[in-house]
Amino acid sequence: MVEPGNLAGATGAEWIGRPPHEELQRKVRPLLPSDDPFYFPPAGYQHAVPGTVLRSRDVELAFMGLIPQPVTATQLLYRTTNMYGNPEATVTTVIVPAELAPGQTCPLLSYQCAIDAMSSRCFPSYALRRRAKALGSLTQMELLMISAALAEGWAVSVPDHEGPKGLWGSPYEPGYRVLDGIRAALNSERVGLSPATPIGLWGYSGGGLASAWAAEACGEYAPDLDIVGAVLGSPVGDLGHTFRRLNGTLLAGLPALVVAALQHSYPGLARVIKEHANDEGRQLLEQLTEMTTVDAVIRMAGRDMGDFLDEPLEDILSTPEVSHVFGDTKLGSAVPTPPVLIVQAVHDYLIDVSDIDALADSYTAGGANVTYHRDLFSEHVSLHPLSAPMTLRWLTDRFAGKPLTDHRVRTTWPTIFNPMTYAGMARLAVIAAKVITGRKLSRRPL
């Protein structure tokens, strides 16, 4: 975990370049991040403080890359920090409500997508753009949730929280990228947000994991930010347990993607793979770096990672190098300072509810304000939309400064049996219809 005093910008001279801005280019097919000069930071950027905007541009967004959205979107390349304290640059896409007047204060939500892949086709800054070729990216569908937040009258920051290399599963640094993306949004003159803006975090599944790292890091890494609440939807609390749970199942592609990414963050893991993976296994991990999430799930359905090793899988998982990785990537190393709402399905086939029970207990024992919705009816995919009305109401209360209720530790009543869920889902259906037809969103708070 990075100590604030170890940041490169803390000892170097501040980068004093003026960030250049690119005006909107309509109907232009976006380049992949690996080929797009916008993503490459200028010389000397490492001396900038985290959250400094290095360049910006206006972009068109489109649902599934095809249906243009009538929203104002600005992308910011900004300086941030990786898990080892080294400077890097990544991008956030900031969307501002159409009716927001210059200088007007509105809440800012950092929405973390379930990128869940190394391929830059899945990065929000690419996948959300008009004419993006991102078939198989989960990110494109999440424009519906982002639009629901915009309809509340909130500005939304959507960071590439896996960083420029798509290192899914790496600890700590997703939180730094989220927090520095918020700083960049507040610092950007182009975006025009007030410094007094209250801030919320929201993400589900892989996005919930990134949101959890941000919630855990913000007290020490970004005490300057007024983060009033964080919603952690089905975060991956224990990657080691999840690997064992999903390996060999229809969703085996997900842990395989994580291993493909983590070998780039942990030299010890890379060494174990080099020594024990067969040629087919090494070739597969290389191919996974270019696959979208859906591609990987289809290709790896039912595959057992042990089939690509020269020793039993459990022996490999028990090595000091792999044990260190799984221990390091487990949530709960710090206690969130803002109030958190944790949402988890009891019958989740992807994330074991016991992992999230343990995480909630750890946060509560550490003194965090935890509201835990432990849903008895839903499963992994359905709980995200079904819990969205509850999430939006909870965030609205945090932005309004309302006190938390006394009964905030754990609820089990299924969202599907709550009448307010249906009113909220009806509202979300109207928003989804407007997104799918490319119509302008009007403010429709719950």
Curated annotation (Swiss-Prot):
- Residues in a coiled coil are none
PANTHER family of this UniProt entry?
Answer: LIPASE 5, PTHR34853
What InterPro entries does this protein's entry cite? AB_hydrolase_fold, Lipase_secreted
Q: What is this protein called?
A: Probable inactive lipase MT1628
Highest taxon above the source species: Bacteria
> Which source organism does the UniProt entry give?
Mycobacterium tuberculosis (strain CDC 1551 / Oshkosh)
The Gene Ontology terms for molecular function here are: triacylglycerol lipase activity
UniProt lists the family membership as follows: Belongs to the AB hydrolase superfamily. Lipase family.
Name the Gene3D superfamilies on file: 1.10.260.130, alpha/beta hydrolase (3.40.50.1820)
A GO BP term here is: lipid catabolic process
